[in-house]
Amino acid sequence: MVCLEIIRPILLQCKFLGHIRSRLSLPCNCSYQYDVDPVTQSFTNRRVFAYSDSGIPDGIQLDTNGNVYSGCGEGTHVWNPEGTLIGKFFLNSTTAEMIFTKSGLLILDEERIYLADIQAQGIDLAAY
């Protein structure tokens, strides 16, 4: 089993000789992937899954083909199971959340709700 984690940049202020240095942003705008130990359920083998080229990934959904959906700076990005970007829903705003429905993918941005008529289906978490 594999677990995905989206990490937001952490802003740090460092004091050096009484002066506040510029903020450092750690880590990158990326999603991490882990292996999950089937016995202990602990996460191991952390590695970068995918990078966002616009904004910070926020929210995560998976479809039945293993594709990963995440809200980013310009809309929703879609990566295949290997972490290659395969599509974007351009909304010209930051996506806050995505939800698979029987009618498609419901996308919520900062002010509006969109329904994308797509063939992909969300995974059934009750099966896990």
Where are these regions (language model features)?
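Blade-edge beta-strand/turn elements of extracellular beta-propeller
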Residues: 1-4, 35-53, 78-91
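Beta-rich, blade/repeat-based domains predominating
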Residues: 1-23, 51-73, 92-104, 108
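Short loop/turn segments immediately following the C-termini of beta-strands
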Residues: 16, 24-27, 36, 73, ...
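A detector of repeated loop/turn-to-beta-strand junctions in beta-rich toroidal repeat architectures
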Residues: 28-30, 43
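WD40 beta-propeller blade core
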Residues: 32, 77-78, 114
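Short loop/turn segments immediately following beta-strands, especially the blade-tip
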Residues: 34-41, 117-125
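Short glycine/proline-enriched turn or capping motifs at secondary-structure junctions
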Residues: 101, 105-123
